Amino acid sequence: MEKFTDLNYTLSVITLMNSTLHTILEDPGMAYFPYIASVLTVLFTLHKASIPTMKIALKTSKCSYKVVKYCIVTILNTLLKLAGYKEQITAKDEIEKQMDRVVKEMRRQLEMIDKLTTREIEQVELLKRIYDKLIVRSTGEIDMTKEINQKNVRTLEEWESGKNPYEPKEVTAAM
């Protein structure tokens, strides 16, 4: 039953708006019709949206002051947006929430910076150790006899039997 009453009320308001607009349109000097129609539409929408919302919110909420304040702030922010302003009205609670969020984000960033700094220090220490191992040290004169295997080269007099062991020998094979 309440819905039918609400529907009748809405229809009567729309009829009232239409009759008002028709009387305005009959006046040929009226050049601001679109603006007036927009304002009336916004006001009607706000009226229809805010009153039931406020009733429900006040019935279900234990803290009606906060609900009323939030609804008023929301309505004012909507009107400011419609007027073209980018600024918004914020409640004190919202400012505190935003500050807490900013502080939390700053703490997270500081922890991240601390971790990255620690990793960078560890990487620098590792690079220093690698560099120290790769550093070229001069040892002075290098003994090249080991490189070309000249220590095992013997002359004919140094061989034990006096024969060259690398000369081919006559080999016989069994058939």
Swiss-Prot record:
The family assignment reads: Belongs to the rotavirus NSP4 family.
What post-translational modification does the entry describe?
A: The N-glycosyl content is primarily Man(9)GlcNAc, with a small amount of Man(8)GlcNAc.
Q: What is this protein called?
A: Non-structural glycoprotein 4
Q: Which GO terms describe its cellular component?
A: extracellular region; host caveola; host cell rough endoplasmic reticulum membrane; membrane
Q: What is this protein's function per UniProt?
A: Plays an essential role in the virus replication cycle by acting as a viroporin. Creates a pore in the host endoplasmic reticulum and as a consequence releases Ca(2+) in the cytoplasm of infected cell. In turn, high levels of cytoplasmic calcium trigger membrane trafficking and transport of viral ER-associated proteins to viroplasms, sites of viral genome replication and immature particle assembly. The secreted form acts as an enterotoxin that causes phospholipase C-dependent elevation of the intracellular calcium concentration in host intestinal mucosa cells. Increased concentration of intracellular calcium disrupts the cytoskeleton and the tight junctions, raising the paracellular permeability. Potentiates chloride ion secretion through a calcium ion-dependent signaling pathway, inducing age-dependent diarrhea.
NAD recorded as keyword: no
Subunit relationships:
Homotetramer. Interacts with the immature particle in the viroplasm. Interacts with host CAV1, early and late in infection. Interacts with host integrin ITGA1/ITGB1 heterodimer. Interacts with host integrin ITGA2/ITGB1 heterodimer. Interaction with microtubules blocks trafficking to the Golgi apparatus.
User: One GO molecular-function annotation for this sequence?
Assistant: channel activity
Binding of Ca(2+) occurs at E120, Q123
Species of the source: Rotavirus A (strain RVA/Human/Japan/S2/1980/G2P1B[4]) (RV-A)
- Compartments where found: Host rough endoplasmic reticulum membrane; Host membrane, Host caveola; Secreted
Q: Which residues lie on this side of the membrane: Lumenal?
A: 1-28
Transmembrane segment boundaries? 29-51
Pfam families for the chain: Rota_NSP4
